UniProtKB/Swiss-Prot annotation:
Keywords: Cell cycle, Cell division, Cell membrane, Cell shape, Cell wall biogenesis/degradation, Glycosyltransferase, Membrane, Peptidoglycan synthesis, Transferase. Belongs to the glycosyltransferase 28 family. MurG subfamily. Cell wall formation. Catalyzes the transfer of a GlcNAc subunit on undecaprenyl-pyrophosphoryl-MurNAc-pentapeptide (lipid intermediate I) to form undecaprenyl-pyrophosphoryl-MurNAc-(pentapeptide)GlcNAc (lipid intermediate II). Pfam families: Glyco_tran_28_C, Glyco_transf_28. One of its GO terms (cellular component) is plasma membrane. InterPro entries: GlcNAc_MurG, Glyco_trans_28_C, GlycoTrans_28_N. This is UDP-N-acetylglucosamine--N-acetylmuramyl-(pentapeptide) pyrophosphoryl-undecaprenol N-acetylglucosamine transferase. UDP-N-acetyl-alpha-D-glucosamine binds at residues 12-14, 166, 196, 291. It is found in: Cell membrane. Its EC number is 2.4.1.227. It comes from the Bacteria. It comes from Geobacillus kaustophilus (strain HTA426).
Length: 357
């Protein structure tokens, strides 16, 4: 009899990409797959491009670190989402639920618990996010990317897995990436990206330095939806993308160095590809500090240069990029020491074992 799994997670691409990595492996094993996400989250677009995975949406809310009248309404949206998820899980009868986090995952994990269906949560960041904190007491297993995270969760449920990276990222072709960007190959390539939603601060600082940086680098700029600068279209050596999907492996293969936010999925993908990285984590004022912890961990391991957002200026960005490029060989040697493991297979084994409970 075929096994069935419900996957959930969304809000940002980071809460979806582990699921994207799991889907082909689960299909190879003969699993039926269903996805539960939000009505309008980025997960709907990403999963919608994958054949054979039905998508259902439920109501959800979010945590805002500022006053908003929606903060009073959202708890009721979450309760509505729990009821919707409960009914969907009752109908689909999965053997197990897997969550990658994000606020849409809370109703789904609660719905699984109410139905007596075992669930597995994957926490990417060093410190757990609020959605996972709420959901963890109701989960069967908690898979960790950083071993240090064990101190923040129920140790009896916790399993260190490591970072799950999509196989296709390793299949990039630098020459194909060069053709996409129409670069001539005479300069090293700098790739800058601010996460799936983009980063105005990184975008502004990079563009303010553009003429200086273009003297030394060809630049790929993944700037986020709605953040293309039309005045820079056609600028030699500078290629803008709002968001990339199939193109990303080729662009990463082409890049010599990368400027990035410090979301866990992104930085572990860069680590797996041995890409020297300048990390600019979201500030404490704009987040719960998870990216700062991630960045400091990579800095301590010698994998990354770190520039705090509070210290981000046109001058500091330019100086940090130069330091990164000058020391790229050292960073790559440190990353080689990270060794090889297969977190995806470990995670699959945990999911299969949990489904048998």
């Amino acid at each position: 009899m075929r096994k069935k799994i419900i996957l959930t997670g969304g809000g940002t691409a980071g809460h979806v990409m582990v699921n994207v990595a799991l889907i082909p492996k689960l299909k190879e094993l003969g699993w039926d797959i269903v996805y539960i996400g939000s009505h309008q989250g980025i997960e709907r677009e990403i999963i919608g491009r994958i054949d054979g995975v039905p998508y259902y949406s439920v109501s959800t809310g979010k945590l805002r670190r500022y006053f908003d009248w929606k903060n009073f309404k959202d708890p009721f949206n979450v309760l509505k989402g729990v009821w919707q998820a409960y009914r969907l899980i009752q109908k689909e009868k999965p053997d197990v639920v897997f969550s990658k986090g994000g606020f849409v995952s809370v109703p789904v994990i609660l719905g699984a618990w109410l139905n007596g269906v075992p669930s597995v949560i994957h926490e990417s960041d060093l410190t757990p996010g609020l959605a996972n904190k709420i959901a963890m007491p109701f989960a069967t297993k908690i898979c960790l990317t950083f071993p240090e995270t064990k101190q923040y969760v129920n140790a009896d449920k916790a399993v260190y897995v490591g970072a799950v990276v999509r196989d296709e990222l390793k299949d990039g072709n630098a020459e194909q990436g060069r053709k996409m960007c129409q670069f001539d190959g005479k300069k090293p390539v700098l790739l800058a990206m601010g996460g799936s939603l983009g980063s105005k601060k990184i975008n502004d600082a990079l563009r303010a330095n553009l003429s200086t940086l273009l003297a030394e680098f060809d630049i790929i700029h993944i700037c986020g939806k709605g953040n293309i600068d039309p005045s820079l279209a056609g600028q030699k050596g500078y290629k803008q993308f709002e968001y990339v999907n199939e193109e990303l492996p080729h662009l990463l293969a082409l890049a010599d160095i990368v400027v990035s936010r410090a979301g866990a999925n992104a930085i572990f993908e860069l680590l797996s590809l041995r890409k020297p990285m300048l990390l600019i984590p979201l500030s404490k004022a704009a987040s719960r500090g998870d990216q700062i912890a991630n960045a400091r961990s990579f800095e301590k391991a010698g994998y990354a240069e770190v520039l705090m957002e509070e210290d981000l200026t046109n001058e500091s960005l330019q100086a940090a990029i130069h330091r990164l490029y000058e020391n790229k060989d050292r960073y790559q040697k440190n990353m080689e020491k990270a060794g090889a493991s297969d977190p995806l297979q470990t995670l699959l084994a945990i999911i299969q074992d949990t489904a048998r409970l």
